[in-house]
């Protein structure tokens, strides 16, 4: 459906810190989580609301708004997607978690699935797919394919940084999906890495650089 680039000053400031050479694992991990929180706020801004009557603190009846029965599952793509989990779950503590594992063949750049554990009623849920990077789009497309095969009807993608090639490829394959990101960067290099990007986000999150 669309690509949403979040230009909020806090998002851009934190992303700028993440791009810095020599950033520590601790700082990168914390910033990844924080930007994940801010992007999730944006991705959930259109959740439907309904009126509910409650008893307020002083015993009187009060009409308030609650999210209208929207069930959500957060879908981190292993392993780097785990770096965004804490930040996302701060806003959605009741969300169920589905996990997808794919790794990229460094020669063909094609995704290789190795793990899939989805909630049983995923067909009734909004799936929020999280991964720091949307590079070639292959891994994201394969993940969305898996979710749709399981019956998922509503999917949003949350990534810190995207390459224009990956955005175009993902939306061409799945035009009904919305993508939320802090930046669409310049391009992919010949190794399939985003330029300027963040480097290898998984290595930086887990300290395996």
UniProtKB/Swiss-Prot annotation:
The record's top EC class is transferase
Q: Which cysteines are joined by disulfide bonds?
A: none
Chain coiled-coil ranges:
none
Which GO BP annotation is one of this protein's?
uracil salvage
Q: Which UniProt keywords apply?
A: Allosteric enzyme, Glycosyltransferase, GTP-binding, Magnesium, Nucleotide-binding, Transferase
**Free-text cofactor note:** Binds 1 Mg(2+) ion per subunit. The magnesium is bound as Mg-PRPP.
* SUPFAM superfamilies xref list: PRTase-like (SSF53271)
Named from the GO MF annotations, one term is: magnesium ion binding
Q: Which cofactor does it need?
A: Mg(2+)
Protein residues bound to 5-phospho-alpha-D-ribose 1-diphosphate: 79, 104, 131-139, 200
> Signal sequence span per UniProt?
none
Q: Which reaction does it catalyse?
A: UMP + diphosphate = 5-phospho-alpha-D-ribose 1-diphosphate + uracil
Name the domain of life. Bacteria
Regulation of protein activity: Allosterically activated by GTP.
Pfam annotation, one family = UPRTase
Pathway per the UniProt entry = Pyrimidine metabolism; UMP biosynthesis via salvage pathway; UMP from uracil: step 1/1
Residues reported in the UniProt entry to bind uracil: 194, 199-201
Assigned EC number: 2.4.2.9
Q: Which HAMAP family match?
A: Upp_B
Annotated PANTHER family: ADENINE PHOSPHORIBOSYLTRANSFERASE, URACIL PHOSPHORIBOSYLTRANSFERASE, CHLOROPLASTIC
This chain's function reads: Catalyzes the conversion of uracil and 5-phospho-alpha-D-ribose 1-diphosphate (PRPP) to UMP and diphosphate.
Return the similarity comment: Belongs to the UPRTase family.
Q: What is this protein called?
A: Uracil phosphoribosyltransferase
> Which species?
Pseudoalteromonas translucida (strain TAC 125)
Q: Which gene encodes it?
A: upp
């Amino acid at each position: 459906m669309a690509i949403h680039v979040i230009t909020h000053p806090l998002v851009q400031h934190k992303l700028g810190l993440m791009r810095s050479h020599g950033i520590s694992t601790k700082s990168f991990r914390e910033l990844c989580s924080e930007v994940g929180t801010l992007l999730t706020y944006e991705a959930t801004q259109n959740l439907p609301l309904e009126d509910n009557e409650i008893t307020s603190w002083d015993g009187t009846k009060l009409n308030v708004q609650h999210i209208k029965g929207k069930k959500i599952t957060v879908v981190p793509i292993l392993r780097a997607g785990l770096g965004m989990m804490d930040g996302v779950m701060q806003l959605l503590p009741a969300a169920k978690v589905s996990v997808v594992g794919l790794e990229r063949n460094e020669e063909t750049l094609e995704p290789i699935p190795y793990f899939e554990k989805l909630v049983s009623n995923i067909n009734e849920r909004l799936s929020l797919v999280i991964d720091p990077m949307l590079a070639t789009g292959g891994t994201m497309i394969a993940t969305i394919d898996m979710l749709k095969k399981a019956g998922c009807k509503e999917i949003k993608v949350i990534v810190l940084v995207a390459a224009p090639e990956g955005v175009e490829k993902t939306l061409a394959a799945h035009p009904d999906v919305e993508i939320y990101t802090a930046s669409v960067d310049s391009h992919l290099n010949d190794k399939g890495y985003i330029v300027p990007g963040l480097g290898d986000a998984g290595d930086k999150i887990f300290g395996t650089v």
